[in-house]
Amino acid sequence: MIISADKSIQKHYAPIPVGNGDLSVMIDFTGSNDCTDPAYSLHRAGIRQQAVNAQLFPFGRITQQYCGNNSEIVDWQQSLDTANGLVSGRTVHKNGVILESRVFCHLEKNVIGFHKIRRNSPGNYTFRFECGNAPRMHFEPCEDGLRWSCDGISEFHGVIHFLSDTPLQRKFENGIYSISAPAEDFTFFMVFDEPEISAYPAFDELLAESAKCWEPFWQEAYIRVPDTELMKTYEVSRYHLRINQTRWSMPVGLFNSHFGGRYFAFDEFFCAHALASCGHFALLKKIIDFRYAGLQWAKYRANGYYHNVRKDARWAWETLENFEEGSLCGHWQDHIFHMAHIALETWYYCCYSGDREYLRSKGIDILEGCAEFYMNQAVISLPDGRKIITKCCDLERFGPGRENAYLTTCSAMAALQIAAECFIAENYCTERAAEYLETVKALRESQPQDENFYFAVPANDQRSVAVLGGIYPYDNVMGFEDEKQRRTIFDFMENDAQFGSMYPHLGGKGNLCRWYAGWESIVLSRYGLRDKAYEVLRDKAEETGMFGQIYELYNARRIPWFATGEGIFIQAVNELFLPNGEKGQGKPPWNEYSFKLRSRHGETVEEHS
């Protein structure tokens, strides 16, 4: 799909990200970072500073100079071809200068290609790479480029080559590496640590090679419906998830503005679920392999000296590539519901893919670690016989030290439920599985409530999206037959505009934030209300940006290309076809449609109306 925007569109503009899970940069309509916030300049996955919260090293800004480019830009167009990641742009200056640009990042090689065509602009075109200047970051010129090194959470080093078929004038001065040529039609590449690419490749040939790498991804799933805006957001969300997937896992985004590209198990689950229902199992497996690789670290975090004899596992809230905690100190470090997200994404990989061998060899260890953490360090047995979840940080807007919080309780129930199902299926620790199920029942009975409603927290001091948790994201653990839960959910939905922001100081803006709308839509689909679920996605949520991109909060212009919201949106759309990953649940809300998705029973489902 080719998605275009221009200066006349009255929506928030954010540059388009290009990358491959290692490289990440946003490209604006000038085909550079000339009109881009410095936060969205070039970054690389995993290359981190030694700062307390281990921000990514900012590699540098891509800027340009040519005769007439100081003149005001009076018109512009920009487009993204999601099939191959090509970003095209055209700018018109007040003085008549026109610049056309094509930019792409190879999906499987660390190469960014640029094609520039100038009109009415005599003299040289100069491409400038303004090197990052973070502490302990160093650049020096070498043949055809720059040698770089960073001393951060580890020592990093490499080479950036600047290649072109045009003879170049090269200069490195004041931290800026520049290449210049008089050509009006100019093609060049930035090549990062790719020793086999030592000569100039043809732009269109390399683009075609990259497009071939994209083909399997797009063939694994599709939807087609007569809703242009929904299709646009669905396609750009899938595009961004693909280029946002690192060799480790799925961050919120690969920029320091996006929580430093760290790995929230809470957020990554929403992307993982979308990957599962789309059948993108190679990508999903990277996520759970990352969590499995960190299992021993998580056991040490949970048990300290006893990590070799106890099975409880507690992963960091904002996990770094070395499995350590990357977040700043705050009450968010007291979250515990993310262990359920790790359990669920592991379970979903095994269910949707049908990979039972992984479940037996590795998955069962992850599920056990999560379940044992809740049993031993979260569930409290009260003198009156009730069981509740201990004080912790539930949703951050509730503040610290919330006991028996609804969402966290649902998370523990879900982790225990699926661990028990797995244990019984594999004939493993069946007596412990029975204890898990007894605990699930006891926790359900102790949820904060009165005769009419469940409460997000016992104090019932504010409504919250948390009350949806018994259906989504926690795998319907409260069941569909509970009328009190249904009343509670619809009571929240009637008031969601007031409470539909995860940040208390940014709530009450009139519309539900886009990713909370996805939560609602999924719940409605699972209740069999797919027309209403579609309406929530289409009419009730905050807007998307010019290219259909999702923001964490659109009205506040906070975090464009927000992977968490993208994952939830994709899953919400997929559940309009297969609610809860189940086929045979009635028709989607269109007369004309086609789709290819994966069911939670390991089947590929393809239908055409």
Where do the PLM segments sit?
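Catalytic cores of secreted or luminal carbohydrate-active enzymes
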Residues: 51-72, 564-598, 602
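Acidic/polar, glycine-enriched structural segments that form the non-catalytic walls/loops
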Residues: 2-261, 293-299
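Structural recognition of the beta-strand scaffold that forms the well-ordered cores
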Residues: 17, 24-27, 284, 316, ...
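Carbohydrate-binding surface patches
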Residues: 108-116, 599-609
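Active-site core of glycosidic bond-cleaving carbohydrate-active enzymes
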Residues: 261-296, 335, 339-344, 348-352, ...
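Amphipathic, well-ordered alpha-helical segments in soluble domains
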Residues: 34, 57-62, 85, 233, ...
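The feature captures the catalytic groove of carbohydrate-active enzymes
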Residues: 252-264, 310-365, 369-437
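Short coil/turn segments at secondary-structure boundaries
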Residues: 210, 214-229, 248-255, 286-288, ...
